[in-house]
Design a protein with these regions (language model features):
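Hot-dog-fold acyl-thioester-processing enzymes
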Residues: 2-97, 159-182
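Short peripheral tails and domain-boundary helices/loops at the edges of structured domains
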Residues: 4, 109, 135-158
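Intrinsic-disorder/low-complexity, polar/charged segments enriched in Ser/Thr/Lys/Arg/Asp/Glu/Gln
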Residues: 20, 26-33, 113-115, 132-134, ...
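Hydrophobic beta-strand core residues of beta-sandwich domains
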Residues: 22-25, 38, 72, 102, ...
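A short acidic/small-residue loop/turn micro-motif
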Residues: 39, 122-123, 154-156
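A structural preference for long, well-packed, hydrophobic secondary-structure segments
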Residues: 95, 101-106, 148, 152-156, ...
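Hydrophobic beta-sheet segments that form the core/acyl-binding groove
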Residues: 98-142
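Short intrinsically disordered coil segments
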Residues: 134-135, 151-154, 166-174
């Protein structure tokens, strides 16, 4: 997916025009992704990577007799795609901190297309350079039916002199030694 395909809006403007820093964000801001169609290749690759060869995902004959009547994508694949579909800029979104309250509401089958809608639910300053942003994420299919929801917390860069200037030798950035100091 290219930047041009992202359809993320914030009060009528595209978030891709300039990355919003933490202090620019407001509770209630929202974004929506473009669509992503789940394919046979996606499901088989995910099964190979994770070792999850449950017949609901991998065996067409078995899945046909299941309550879903067809093969479906792994729930974790759907949630992973949702994270990847979020139109957020890596210059300001530094890390995923947590995934909370993930609920899978209906199956996503091969050939289904998912989209992500996210709303900024909360934010708090973590330090001079970063803050934590909570996004309420809803994943919908091509019929606009809710397939999953979750809340994610991400580490977001603040636009401050401390964030713009590299740390001096004696200062520790919250990310400098590879772990988040909070």
């Amino acid at each position: 997916m290219t930047t041009e395909t992202i359809e993320a809006t914030r009060e009528g403007t595209l978030w891709r025009e300039a990355p919003p820093y933490f202090d620019d964000l407001e509770i209630g801001d929202s974004m929506e992704s473009s669509g992503r169609t789940v394919t046979e290749y996606d499901v088989v690759s995910f099964a190979a990577l994770t070792g999850d060869w449950h017949p609901q995902h991998a065996d067409a004959a078995w899945a046909k007799e299941s309550p879903f009547g067809r093969r479906i994508a792994h729930g974790m694949l759907v949630l992973s795609y949702a994270l990847g579909l979020l139109p957020i800029d890596p210059r300001v979104v530094l890390a995923l901190r947590s995934i909370d309250g993930a609920v899978l509401k209906r199956p996503v089958g091969l050939g289904d297309t998912i989209r992500v809608r996210a709303r900024l639910a909360d934010k708090r300053v973590l330090g001079a350079e970063t803050g934590l942003v909570t996004l309420a994420v809803r994943i919908v299919n091509q019929a606009d039916e809710l397939v999953a929801r979750m809340e994610i917390v991400v580490l977001w860069r603040r636009q401050t002199e401390a964030a713009e200037a590299p740390p001096s030798g004696d200062e520790l950035s919250p990310l400098q030694d590879g772990r988040l100091l909070a």
